[in-house]
A protein has these predicted regions:
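S-adenosylmethionine
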Residues: 1-251
Length: 251
């Protein structure tokens, strides 16, 4: 789980959970993470109802810090926000300052994000249903852009081992096409000097490094440079498989 540092620190949350009969321990390489000692229905806990934490895989918790949020960051656009796990993490890193625009194609997911944001006390999040006209107006406006791209989900086989049998070549071809289209389109939202993070919960190079390389070789990516990338393998970390790449727009 990820501690909501807008409301509480990790030590205090661990103490409150213990008082509710839930034992946990900190993860040393994840500053806002607690791991449960054993499975528990923590969604019924008072700490959850009070918005003191969110359930989020440890690998997923690496994405927001990877974006290098500092005092100069005033606007972040989370382009594929879904129900907002990473959006809420970004809100804590901004300390409820600045503006986070959370976008998605599904209104239902954005409504869930709004509910979670209220529970978390995150007030710097604005949700937007993706609209081509709005996207054009937002070009060049963001200090940071997060693309948590739709993917095969092969990094989460640890939790969903049946997923690999559902993957067909046609699906992979389609998802890779979508990923590149998203990179081409949403990279335009970034300011000169801004940074974009492309992330997936897949470990397939064709969804990850190869997508970034294709983008950098394209007209849309000619002013971008790869700053850093990281692959997290589930068998090494014990958590979900993940990929992250950080690009800077040298415009």
């Amino acid at each position: 789980m990820r501690v909501n540092t807008l409301k509480i620190n990790r030590d205090r949350l661990q103490q409150l959970l213990r008082e509710e009969g839930v034992e946990s321990y900190p993860l040393q390489q994840y500053p806002d993470a607690l791991q449960l000692v054993e499975r528990s229905n923590i969604f019924k806990s008072q700490s959850f109802k009070d918005g003191l934490f969110e359930v989020q895989d440890a690998s997923s918790q690496k994405v927001a810090p990877f974006m290098q949020i500092d005092h100069s960051v005033k606007r972040i656009i989370d382009t594929c926000a879904g129900a907002g796990g990473k959006t809420l993490h970004l809100a804590t890193l901004l300390q409820n300052k600045g503006q986070i625009i959370a976008m998605d194609i599904y209104e239902q997911k954005l409504q869930e994000l709004k509910r979670r944001a209220r529970r978390n006390g995150a007030f710097n999040i604005e949700t937007k249903l993706i609209d081509p006209k709005q996207l054009k107006r937002m070009q060049g406006s963001a200090d940071r852009v997060l693309i948590d791209a739709p993917c095969s989900g092969l990094g989460v086989l640890r939790r969903n081992p049946d997923a690999k049998w559902k993957l067909q070549p046609e699906f992979l071809d389609q998802i890779r096409t979508t990923q590149q289209e998203i990179l081409q389109q949403y990279s335009k939202l970034l300011k000169k000097g801004g940074k974009l993070v492309y992330a997936t919960c897949s470990v397939l190079p064709s969804e990850n490094h190869q997508q970034v390389a294709t983008f950098l070789a394209s007209e849309a990516g000619k002013n971008f440079k790869l700053e850093a990338e990281e692959v997290i393998f589930a068998h090494q970390s014990g958590y979900d498989g993940f990929y992250m790449a950080r690009l800077i727009n040298n415009g």
